[in-house]
From Swiss-Prot:
Residues 1-20 are annotated as: Disordered. GO terms for molecular function: DNA binding; protein heterodimerization activity; structural constituent of chromatin. The keyword Secreted does not apply. It comes from Gallus gallus. This is Histone H4 type VIII. The modification Symmetric dimethylarginine is found at residue 4. The modification N6-acetyllysine is found at residues 6, 9, 13, 17, 32, 60, 80, 92.
C-alpha cells in the first residue's frame, strides 16, 4: 500500500470529482397530500392552510439534526456509508429510540 489508507486501491492522483447537482428547495418534495396523510394517520380531521410550510420547516430541522448525528457516527467509525445503525444511534442520542432496525 502506498499511503492510501484502508482499502486504498486505484492509480493516479485521485481523478476528477463528478459534478454534483446543487440541492436546494428539495423540501418542497414533501407534498401537501403527503403531509395530509401523515396528519390523518395522527388522527387530524381538518388542516389549516398554514400548516404545510410550518410542517416542512419543522421536518427539515429534525432531519438536519438526525443526519448530522448519524454522519458523526459514520465518520468516527471511519466509514463513508451511513448505516441504519448510525441512524438508530443518532435517534437514541436524541431520546427518540427506534426499534426494529438491528442493535
Amino acid at each position: 500500500m502506498s499511503g492510501r489508507g484502508k482499502g486504498g486501491k486505484g492509480l493516479g492522483k485521485g481523478g476528477a470529482k463528478r459534478h454534483r447537482k446543487v440541492l436546494r428547495d428539495n423540501i418542497q418534495g414533501i407534498t401537501k397530500p403527503a403531509i395530509r396523510r401523515l396528519a390523518r394517520r395522527g388522527g387530524v380531521k381538518r388542516i389549516s392552510g398554514l400548516i404545510y410550510e410550518e410542517t416542512r420547516g419543522v421536518l427539515k430541522v429534525f432531519l438536519e439534526n438526525v443526519i448530522r448525528d448519524a454522519v458523526t457516527y459514520t465518520e468516527h467509525a471511519k466509514r463513508k456509508t451511513v448505516t441504519a445503525m448510525d441512524v438508530v444511534y443518532a435517534l437514541k442520542r436524541q431520546e427518540r429510540t427506534l426499534y426494529g432496525f438491528g442493535g
